[in-house]
Amino acid sequence: MREVGQLKLETMLKARMNSQRFSLVLFFALISSLSAQVPEWIWHNQNAADDEVRYFRKEFPVSGTVAKATLTIAADNQVTAYLNGKKIVSNDNWGTPSRVDLTKEIKPGQNVLAAQAKNESGIAALMAKLVLTYADGKKATIVSDPTWVSSDKEAAGWAEPGFAAAGWAKPVSFGKLGVAPWGDVIAGGQASAPAGPAGQATPAAGLTVVDGFKVELLHSASQEEGSWISMAIDAKGRLIVSPQGDKQPLLRITLDPQGQVAKMEKIELPVWTAMGLLHAFDSLYVSGNGPQGTGLYRLRDTNGDDQYDQVDFLRKFEGGGGEHGSHALVLGPDQMIYYIHGNFVKVPSDLSPASQHKNYAEDQLLPRQEDGNGFGVGIKPPGSFVVRMDREGKTCELYASGMRNAYDFDFNAAGEMFTFDSDMEWDWGTPWYRPIRVYHLVSAGDYGFREGTGKFPDYYPDSLPPVVDIGVGSPTGVKFGTRSAFPAKYRKALFIMDWSYGRILAVHMTPAGASYTGMFENFVVGKPLNVTDLEFGKDGAMYFTTGGRGTQAGLYRVTFAGASTAPRSPSAEERKAEREAVAARALRHKLETFHGKVDSHAVDFAWPHLKSNDRWIRYAARLAIESQPVELWQKRALDERDVNASLTALLALARLGSKEVEDELIESLGRSWPDGMNEEQKLEALRASSLAYIRLGRPSTETSQEVIKSLDPLYPSASSRLNRELCQLLIYFEAPGVVRKTLGLLAKAETEEEQLLYMFHLRNARSGWSMEDRRTYFSWFNRDRAQDKHSDETVKWFRDAGRDYGDGASLPKFISNIRKDAVATLTDAERTELAPLIAGQKVVAKAVVQRSFVKDWKLDDFTSAFDQLNKGRSFEKGREAFAVAQCLACHRFGNEGGSTGPDITGAASRFNHRDLLETLVDPSKVVSDQYQNIVVTKKDGSDVTGRLVEESGDKIVLITNPLTGDRTTVSKQDIRKRDPSKISPMPEGLLTILSKEEILDLLAYIESGGKKDHAAFRSR
């Protein structure tokens, strides 16, 4: 990636060349010389392992007398430098490079600069710059860049001239000096990208991009232009962007032939806050707010003057406002409009009878719990969903559902649909946590999201799995590179955006049967890089926006600047695999034509495919059969002998059959159980039987006893997945011995998530307990959680996002609610005897020293002080200010804090200095609907303001004080209305008791993510 400053310099030199008739040779010599002045951060490989050691060398000639030689060198994390085999310096602080005078060490002829560098953890890199000043005043500069060579093995003489570096590799460059996360350490710059002045988006020089690509910052939005959240491209290649702010107009951006901003104009029509934009059918479709509230609007130019002049309101979606509301619009290959919605939106009541997706439900065998903090309380399935509509928005079909809160989606070149779904970050540390992930969205697909603890595990056959799990983050825009001018690998990639941790990732997919599997890599990374949406222009470049929640917005351009290479011809084996994948997808599409439609040919066509080894084919075939009257296929399902076909058909019958057939259904499920089934088939059988009990009711006593008899010998199993299902079923049937067996698994569980799973299910067991068992169970709540571990996969998800693991905000309350449910199963005598264990240990809050008022701080008080955040801040004073300002009372930070507000561990990835401080001094300027209070107006005229955490048929419960957790219950019969509050739950004036220096230390502490070795805390 080239720096913006250098690009401007090149432009200036070009102008000078034209005016003064510079020779082309001289011009490029100047550019080459200037480029060579800037060292790059390099490493042996892209992804460094913890504690790895790597070796680097660069040979260079010296001709003439050297009057001065100065080396500047640093490495993340340690480096020892050698000149001609002699050790010259060691450094273990990459934020403060070593400067060494080598004048006496340089010799005429060949010299070699070498370095041994060690990584501690995370990303690793080496930076070096050697400046030679000759006696005649001329200079030569040797910098770290990909012309060096590197090795992962130490060899005799490796640091000396003349060493044969056969087998040594070209290192990987992460970017030139100034790139995040290191910054310009030579000039003393900060580790994160510079924030720039007010109204300045993160400079392109602060971003890291895949080798061969270049990023440019085209425009930084002014306050009037707003904080951008969505983007579309019209038929003329112009970009249309939407600010998030209320009543801020949409903007249309015209690009010149070089991809630079030539014109920006407002769309002066009353539509705004567009979570989705689509230009199609000579119209601009807007998912946002307008004269008739939140819904789907269409803008048209009716007189041909190239200005939108008409607004049509097409359709309303109840609950469609906000960040969990109605989102992106995409034109499908069938020329239908597809529209994705978040989990707070209700499915339209006028769905077409031909909708592909039906028959979804909670489908929980044991009672689930709502979110511990009350988020999404009372929200019923189907979760986030996609509808398909005609261009007028009239015919509306439910296409797929069961995501959490997918924001955007796109179709690949083969016409397949994919989305990037969000996680519920408050679930971190629980067995029901689902990471952010990419889904292949197919007809009638259910992806298993249910609120609270009810998320389906990926192996449930009545749902579909992800293409790839990404980890932690906040998904925003997605787009395939199909229309890009990128190399073939990236034209096929799905680009996905993570707002929370400042990254655009490229997902590379491989066909797998009728679907795909995937791998991913970081494509563009920055801090902050609050990415929101992307498009590919007519020039094949990627254009992306930043913004959201009032943060600084910007428009960027990504182009491929590397050497083009001819695509590799696929092998015969690859061509065969591709043909098979195309055929599998074609079969799936044929089966999908029967979804939602009664067709006399459907059962006979689909039935043979119930036995397919491809899960996606079985799923499509089952849904084709479920769309037909049950009486046409019920007997066939009960009589089927092929294991795969039988399990799939009986799953359909469990979902749609009647109580009268239940015992026979369970008997048929046991036909090959267990010896005739592999693990996947056992899991399908267990889920099908659970669905029968959920939807058809508890079976007869005789059948129940037979079920216990068949399951009990298999529990516990060597498979954690089988144990998860067997545990629930045996508790459901109150099987003798299930409590003791489950406590045994609890004792052996290696991760907190697995322990919590067994604790969660055991809370439902009302019988089979001894007092010893009860003591074992309740003792778990009082254990030392510091000893608990998490899976390697979980730890990696956090590491990939550049942060440490932290408990989800709802985890403590989930645990508390599990204990409360378990206590409810005790007899009075048990409750008395176990009282000390049940009570546990009370946590006494540390007293906060009373502070005096200092000043009512404003944002302008700090405008000239942001450069003081670079270095020399105090970690201890920042942490103390964090406590004094009561931040931990409401916010998760690392693995501490409350849950009333958002987790701010990764705040530096999405907020620059100015945006972050603004949220502290003016918390009500932007209030996320995820943390928004409601104002309840009672019939007696009084108001109650707080966060809704519980709702039942006759009452609601609000947290009215986020600092103390005080709750107020309001009877529904007393409520006249309820409205969203425009006032942030975060109290104003929290910084008024801090000095300016303390506030700067506080900002540095938050931006560090709680890491003491952050560059901001290094000495000046």
Language-model features and meaning:
Residues S23-S33:
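Bacterial N-terminal signal peptides
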Residues Q37-A48, P108-A191:
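An acidic-aromatic loop/edge-strand motif
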Residues Q37-A49, G175-G212, A566-V582, A847-V854, ...:
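N-terminal pre-domain segments of enzymes
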Residues F60-L83, L113-A115, W168:
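Aromatic-lined ligand-binding clefts that engage carbohydrates, nucleic acids, or primary amines
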Residues A193-T593, Q841, A845, F893-N895, ...:
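Beta-propeller domains with acidic blade repeats across secreted/periplasmic ectodomains
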Residues L218, L284, I337, M542, ...:
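C-terminal capping alpha-helices of c-type cytochrome domains
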Residues A541, E880-N895, D903-G906, N912-D922, ...:
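C-type cytochrome heme c attachment motif
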Residues G547, T551, F560-A881, T900, ...:
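Long, ordered, helix-rich scaffold segments
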